[in-house]
């Protein structure tokens, strides 16, 4: 199931993932992604999402897509850059839900931001279309190769960014 937010009501978007979805299931999923109050305060489940979800923020769109996926209840989930171009709060909500989901389901996370995959059972470091390294975060860090170098660089950049805005 490839999540796309359609120009329909929120309820109808959930029904595309699970035809017989209940309001309780929808509200539970919305609470998990911290959208419950926003949806209830802005038209409820009958709120129409405009073309390309232009009437909600990028973070809200990503969290709504995740909520729809949670209701779909599949065995395998693939998240491809699930936290790209969103605010830090939305990123934390999404990653916490993905981590929780991975306790019961098979989850594949594709991410350029390595901080999002540190807790993964296995990380595949791909460069130029080829798997160059694989292992846990600690194993890859101990190799002192591509993954470790990129992770360290990203961490330094993020720490520098935090210092600049603090």
Report residues per predicted region.
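C-terminal portion of ABC ATPase nucleotide-binding domains
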Residues: 24, 41, 96, 118-166
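Hydrophobic anchor residue at the start of the ABC signature
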Residues: 66, 110
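Conserved catalytic loops of ABC-family nucleotide-binding domains
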Residues: 100-109, 117
